[in-house]
Regions:
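A mid-to-C-terminal "edge-of-domain" accessory segment
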Residues: 14-143
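C-terminal helical cap(s) of enzyme catalytic domains, especially alpha/beta-barrels
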Residues: 1-21
């Protein structure tokens, strides 16, 4: 039912506020004792997440230009804001420096600190997954 609502909204056939849809889906998943898969479209934990350099760079550029509308739609058929979510840029082995700088800026660190950027970038390249916020915080405190 959730995907029907999303598609009806995208088609302009229904004008419901879908910002609470993720909460409703979680409630149904709990009631049915069936967890939502992280890769489930629009609602899953991985929806609207990227650590890939080229994807993140496009989102970062749109943010830098002040174009939040575009940032919310790049590489996404469904705007994250439609369902009360935001695009999330993470740092992993396929990330570029733009991911690192964006994360640093968003978390109150200096994105122009070249040593810090290099430390995080190199740590990400040595992994096979995205770095956690805790791991990034530790890397920020080193040095």
């Amino acid at each position: 039912m959730d995907m029907i609502l999303v598609n009806l909204k995208l088609l302009g056939a229904h004008d419901a506020d879908l910002s609470v849809l993720p909460e409703y889906c979680e409630l149904v998943a709990e009631a049915c004792q069936i967890p939502l898969v992280h890769s489930y479209p629009v609602i899953g934990a991985d929806a609207f997440r990227t650590a890939t350099g080229v994807h993140a760079a496009a989102i970062v550029k749109a943010h830098a230009k002040g174009d939040e509308w575009l940032a919310d739609r790049i590489y996404s058929a469904v705007p994250a804001s439609m369902v009360g979510r935001k695009q999330v840029i993470e740092i992993g082995p396929m990330s570029g420096l733009s991911n690192v700088k964006f994360w640093l800026r968003a978390n109150g660190y200096n994105p122009e600190d070249e040593e810090l950027c290099t430390r995080i970038f190199q740590a990400a390249k040595k992994t096979d997954r995205t770095l956690t916020k805790g791991e990034l915080e530790v890397l920020c405190k080193m040095g």
